[in-house]
């Protein structure tokens, strides 16, 4: 993806580092995640307690910074922090990591396979950034739909990130 979007060597390295480490704390138990939140003074909401899978983005960012000092930059850590929920005013690299994680080839759900095909096919008359934004919006829509249908809590950051992209698309 970095090549498709013409990232600089430095940005490519930052994105690559974040991609390698984005799930570094994913296998930790909810109790271990809460302990890491205390250690790193990370605030979390009731949403995180209801959906513990969200913790790993925040804890992973801080853990990676601590464990890989000098390799993991604050920018790479921010990419890790937002790779699950997104955020308002997402950067190009944040969108790329979120999407790469969401549509990676190990994801076999039909809707994600379709989204992966949509992303990698020719964007038609749209420029690449518009195509990326449209794909990220579609990814958020799939995520929200899945969470609604399975009766799970939806994180406010995801809704805000999605709405932000839609509002900006209209301008």
Language-model region placement:
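Divalent metal-dependent phosphate-bond-processing catalytic cores, especially two-metal-ion Mg2+/Mn2+ enzymes
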Residues: 1-9, 21-25, 66-74, 81-171
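His-Asp-centered metal-binding catalytic motifs of divalent-metal-dependent phosphohydrolases/nucleases
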Residues: 12-45, 60, 78-86
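Short amphipathic alpha-helical segments, especially helix-boundary/capping motifs
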Residues: 34-40, 54-55, 70, 76, ...
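Active-site metal-coordination segments of metallo-dependent hydrolases
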Residues: 46-58
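Alpha-helical segment that forms one wall of the substrate-binding/catalytic cleft
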Residues: 56-66
